């Protein structure tokens, strides 16, 4: 045991050598002692090592081409949107790393600002799924919010802080991890200003929500009620910094294409001007020519648009794309239903004509890829009801007639085993 002094019984820290009089606290172990200063130092070292382990190293951050390739495995089509998202997400997390690791001392300090994303496109074309797949690849907390449920603070509905609460919950209340997550706000076109001119009456679910979202989109220290502000007004708040939270804001923006066409059509006036018909614009990406002035005319306020510098548009899915969605992705619907039938010991097969007929119905209903599952359920419902109760079915074949004419799928009976044939003959 380490002692110090003239015959005294002063104890020393076994690590730094300071006596018990030189420190606030000395903790004894089996034959060793440690002071409070050494404990603090150990804690600091451990925290630094844990922080380094949690941070995604720049070498490990997937490149834009790798992000796009990963998206290709799950999402069919939308190549322009994939490229835009891949670059935006890569630059966003590269910016976070630059802030955490510090900048190269040889370079002049440059502050990298955040670039949130605005996604435009019809319903059922993969906007939400693209964002979900991105979060899955990057292994970051991901939360989805519906803009139509939001209102200004003090009115019936959800506060914008509830969006941040969903992200914190997705991160298992790990605030540090939530601060580098992704928030997807859907139906943002529904909070457009009701008229182009500012109203004297309060628009609490439109322009008011846009105003409330400005700060968290830009980056602020927000106070989030852990159980919802409306029901528990006296609870303690969670502090979260949204500076490094990536916001992907999306909507169908029905009617925006007319605003774009009116503006683009005016350019076709005069000699030598390129004239584009409405049919030509409709067959291409509706929102490829979108400008901030179009979004302002639609009903978004300039400050809101300014915080969404990256614009990615998705297009209507054609028949070929819908057929590919049914069968090609890693978690394609056809593969899912084949697996469900396998669990009952039955093989399931779709003819090529059947897949095309399902795609035709989805286009006719105007539901895009989102409507494919509903059509599959309708087609397979009769056999999914009967199959579990039968043991004489080997295979179910879905044909074009099954989809178009509501004809039952073709059922291929199972051949009886040798023992079953013997029992039957007996």
Swiss-Prot record:
GO biological process: cell division; proteolysis involved in protein catabolic process
GO molecular function, one term: protein dimerization activity
Keywords of the record: ATP-binding, Chaperone, Metal-binding, Nucleotide-binding, Zinc
Location of the ClpX-type ZB domain: 1-54
UniProt: Zn(2+) binding residues: 13, 16, 35, 38
InterPro entries named in the record: AAA+_ATPase, ATP-dep_Clp_protease_ClpX, ATPase_AAA_core, Clp_ATPase_C, Clp_protease_ATP-bd_su_ClpX, ClpX_bact, P-loop_NTPase, Znf_CppX_C4
UniProt binding sites for ATP: 122-129
Pfam family, one: zf-C4_ClpX
Superkingdom of source: Bacteria
GO cellular component term, pick one: HslUV protease complex
Keyword Protein biosynthesis belongs to the record: no
Function: ATP-dependent specificity component of the Clp protease. It directs the protease to specific substrates. Can perform chaperone functions in the absence of ClpP.
The family this protein is said to belong to: Belongs to the ClpX chaperone family.
Subunit and interaction comment: Component of the ClpX-ClpP complex. Forms a hexameric ring that, in the presence of ATP, binds to fourteen ClpP subunits assembled into a disk-like structure with a central cavity, resembling the structure of eukaryotic proteasomes.
Listed NCBIfam families: clpX, PRK05342.1
Record protein name field: ATP-dependent Clp protease ATP-binding subunit ClpX
Organism field: Mycobacterium bovis (strain BCG / Pasteur 1173P2)
Higher taxonomy: Bacteria, Bacillati, Actinomycetota, Actinomycetes, Mycobacteriales
Gene for this chain: clpX
């Amino acid at each position: 045991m380490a002692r110090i002094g003239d015959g005294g019984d002063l104890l020393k820290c076994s690590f730094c050598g300071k006596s018990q009089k030189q420190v606030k606290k000395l903790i004894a172990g089996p034959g060793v002692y440690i002071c409070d200063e050494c404990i603090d130092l150990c804690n600091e070292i451990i925290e630094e090592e844990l922080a380094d382990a949690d941070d995604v190293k720049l070498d490990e951050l997937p490149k834009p081409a790798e992000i796009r390739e990963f998206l290709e495995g799950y999402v069919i089509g939308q190549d322009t949107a994939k490229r835009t998202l891949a670059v935006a997400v890569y630059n966003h997390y590269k910016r976070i790393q630059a802030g955490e690791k510090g900048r190269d001392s040889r370079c002049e300090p440059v502050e990298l600002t955040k670039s949130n994303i605005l996604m435009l496109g019809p319903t059922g074309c993969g906007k939400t799924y693209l964002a979900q797949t991105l979060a899955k690849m990057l292994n970051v907390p991901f939360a989805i919010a519906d803009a139509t449920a939001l209102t200004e603070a003090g009115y019936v509905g959800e506060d914008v802080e509830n969006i941040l609460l969903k992200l914190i919950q997705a991160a298992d209340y790990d605030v540090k991890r939530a601060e580098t997550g992704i928030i997807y706000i859907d139906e943002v076109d529904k909070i457009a200003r009701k008229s182009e001119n500012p109203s004297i009456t309060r628009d609490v679910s439109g322009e008011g929500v846009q105003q409330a979202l400005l700060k968290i989109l830009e980056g602020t220290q927000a106070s989030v009620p852990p159980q919802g502000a409306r029901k528990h007004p006296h609870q303690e708040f969670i502090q979260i910094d949204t500076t490094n939270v990536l916001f992907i804001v999306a909507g169908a923006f029905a009617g925006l294409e007319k605003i774009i066409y009116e503006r683009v059509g005016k350019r076709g006036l005069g000699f030598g001007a390129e004239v584009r018909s409405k049919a030509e614009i409709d067959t291409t990406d509706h929102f490829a020519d979108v400008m901030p002035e179009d979004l302002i005319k639609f009903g978004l306020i300039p400050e809101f648009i300014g915080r969404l510098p990256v614009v990615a548009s998705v297009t209507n899915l054609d028949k070929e794309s819908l057929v590919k969605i049914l069968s090609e992705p890693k978690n394609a619907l056809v593969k899912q239903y084949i697996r469900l039938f396998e669990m009952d010991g039955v093989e399931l097969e779709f003819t090529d004509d059947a897949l095309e007929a399902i795609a035709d119905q989805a286009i006719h209903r105007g539901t895009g890829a989102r409507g494919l599952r509903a059509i599959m359920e309708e087609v397979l419902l009769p056999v999914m009801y009967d199959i579990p109760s039968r043991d004489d079915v080997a295979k179910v074949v879905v044909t074009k007639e099954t989809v178009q004419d509501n004809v039952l799928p073709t059922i291929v009976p199972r051949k009886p085993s040798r023992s079953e044939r013997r029992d039957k003959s007996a």
